[in-house]
Amino acid sequence: MSKSENLFAAARELIPGGVNSPVRAFTGVGGTPLFIERADGAYLYDADGKAYIDYVGSWGPMVLGHNHPAIRNAVIEAAERGLSFGAPTEMEVKMAQLVTELVPTMDMVRMVNSGTEATMSAIRLARGFTRRDKIIKFEGCYHGHADHLLVKAGSGALTLGQPNSPGVPADFAKHTLTCTYNDLASVREAFELYPQDIACIIVEPVAGNMNCIPPQPDFLPGLRALCDEFGALLIIDEVMTGFRVALAGAQAYYNVVPDLTCLGKIIGGGMPVGAFGGRREVMEALAPTGPVYQAGTLSGNPIAMAAGFACLSEVAQPGVHSTLDALTTQLAEGLLDAAQEAGVPLVVNHVGGMFGFFFTDADSVTCYHDVVKCDVERFKRFFHLMLEEGVYFAPSAFEAGFMSVAHSEEDINNTIDAARRVFAKL
């Protein structure tokens, strides 16, 4: 047995499913998950010493690559001064200044510890500010594991939401309306059914939790217009897309102004950090200046703030996003060409430093209903054959891929060459 297999067997006796986040268990592809010993640049090294070109990037944060010296040194320096104070620090102020400079729609920002905390708190704030209860989310979009977000559509487009996890009370789920991504008509229908009850829309500007689905040109502006028409807030969940699709996020790339923005992943440089922020009048409804409560013992943790500040300072340098986009485009076009040469039907979506590919005969993939029609079994075979080639894609057909500026053109070419060999076997 490999060391990963031994570790997984031991982990399953101690940790539910052997992992601390479900997708890591390889349940979407089968087999034994890789146990990682270390990472550097564009590469992961597993417990058995094998190297992999990594397109997961810790599920998004590693836009600069693994073990970046500026981030590592910032963490070491901060740790020497103490790990947690439970009191304000100068670095929190510097971090808030940097975030609000980089994302102009955020007048104020509150630091938290995860993307889930960010979305959960932003929705509570929207409900408190508007004094309304219902929210709109989109089928196939993921905004963390808060109870009111673990909701699927009912039997009809506008039936009350149903929990998609045991432990979520139906009384919570009934306040969540689930619409179809890239379908403005379904959103208008929801507003017309509940014109005085909807507090907010929360949306991934590029849906990264049903692989990678960019918005149609009219979708995000249409959501903004509907929120304005019906007095709801627009929350853009940039946990994945923030500082990755563009420096100021997908909201800048697609030219839409939200009321609130949620951030995570890159904002922590690999440490557990989330944030939410937006219009001053909305944010000032948050405790202690307002009545909407939110708190956290480790929020604004000095180590995490140091890592995040170092990461964002590097990400803001000229050329980072043009490099990221060029590398992602090279990979996306190369995978598509290789698949076509082998006669394998494939759709590839990409924007900024995100990408996704779908084994399907369809011309395009634009929503959850398209995604679930794709050939998951073919993806599983592709994943494992690429893993044998030393290339690590997300172990799920429903997760986006992430590029870093640490990837070289040689890494991309080697990946495409490996894919060409694998497509020939499919």
From Swiss-Prot:
GO molecular function: glutamate-1-semialdehyde 2,1-aminomutase activity; pyridoxal phosphate binding; transaminase activity
Family, similarity comment: Belongs to the class-III pyridoxal-phosphate-dependent aminotransferase family. HemL subfamily.
Modified residues (N6-(pyridoxal phosphate)lysine): K265
Catalysed transformations (reactions): (S)-4-amino-5-oxopentanoate = 5-aminolevulinate
One GO cellular component term: cytoplasm
Organism of provenance: Cronobacter sakazakii (strain ATCC BAA-894)
A family per Pfam: Aminotran_3
Protein name in UniProt: Glutamate-1-semialdehyde 2,1-aminomutase
Pathway the protein contributes to: Porphyrin-containing compound metabolism; protoporphyrin-IX biosynthesis; 5-aminolevulinate from L-glutamyl-tRNA(Glu): step 2/2
Subunit details: Homodimer.
GO-annotated biological processes: protoporphyrinogen IX biosynthetic process
